[in-house]
Amino acid sequence: MNALLTNPFKERLRKGEVQIGLWLSSTTSYMAEIAATSGYDWLLIDGEHAPNTIQDLYHQLQAVAPYASQPVIRPVEGSKSLIKQVLDIGAQTLLIPMVDTADQARQVSSATRYPPYGERGVGASVARAARWGRIENYMAQVNDSLCLLVQVESKTALDNLDEILDVEGIDGVFIGPADLSASLGYPDNAGHPEVQRIIETSIRRIRAAGKAAGFLAVAPDMAQQCLAWGANFVAVGVDTMLYSDALDQRLAMFKSGKNGPRIKGSY
């Protein structure tokens, strides 16, 4: 199979294009495929807070593969062994949570790349990523098609942001609003003026360094604000929250005293 590996999500980030995404926390390929038919530019398949196994992630990658929406996998953490598994099942774009230092960023970057550029384990002949050995020259071309995003979501990470941005192999930095606001002393309050100020300056610093800047904002006005600050990959909802809100709104039409939607600034 003489196939050229491409990553449309990464290519659009390189061009500075804005990409609108959706968070998938439902853990099912059925819901993932429904989301893929909606036309979002990218879909974050969450393995950090949603109870996704490697097989769950694999099945969701299969479900969205026929569609234009680009999958982004967030594993529960950035260990070398877990990154190897996620890449082998076919993920091309990773979002690694809780990256606090440049050393962590370098370790993550190394784990995504084959030698001599990194230390990813070699197993293309048994991996979906290489179509079980049928993609010719897979190891020679895969590094260029991988997109590595890291999450900055603590005060420590903010203090080290410039050093993280300098790490080779990091394509973008995602600001995690929920954990960041808690780390700054404002738990469950990403809308606090001080948190908002830090989010704005961080997004601008990321873009000034030539990297992509990402954010999750379930409130439309917050999403628009982040786009105005320069964020260029923004998730504007979470599937489980949208589903529960839709259920609540429908029930409220027929039963008095029921609550309406609960959309907030963070999840």
Curated annotation (Swiss-Prot):
Enzymatic class: lyase
Keyword Metal-binding on entry: yes
Documented EC number(s): 4.1.2.53
Keywords: Lyase, Magnesium, Metal-binding
UniProt remark on cofactor binding: Binds 1 Mg(2+) ion per subunit.
InterPro entries associated with the record: Aldolase/citrate-lyase_domain (IPR005000), HpcH-HpaI_aldolase (IPR050251), KDR_aldolase (IPR023593), Pyrv/PenolPyrv_kinase-like_dom (IPR015813), Pyrv_kinase-like_dom_sf (IPR040442)
Binding-site residues, substrate: 151, 178-179
Function, as annotated: Catalyzes the reversible retro-aldol cleavage of 2-keto-3-deoxy-L-rhamnonate (KDR) to pyruvate and lactaldehyde.
HAMAP family documented for this protein: KDR_aldolase
Protein name: 2-keto-3-deoxy-L-rhamnonate aldolase
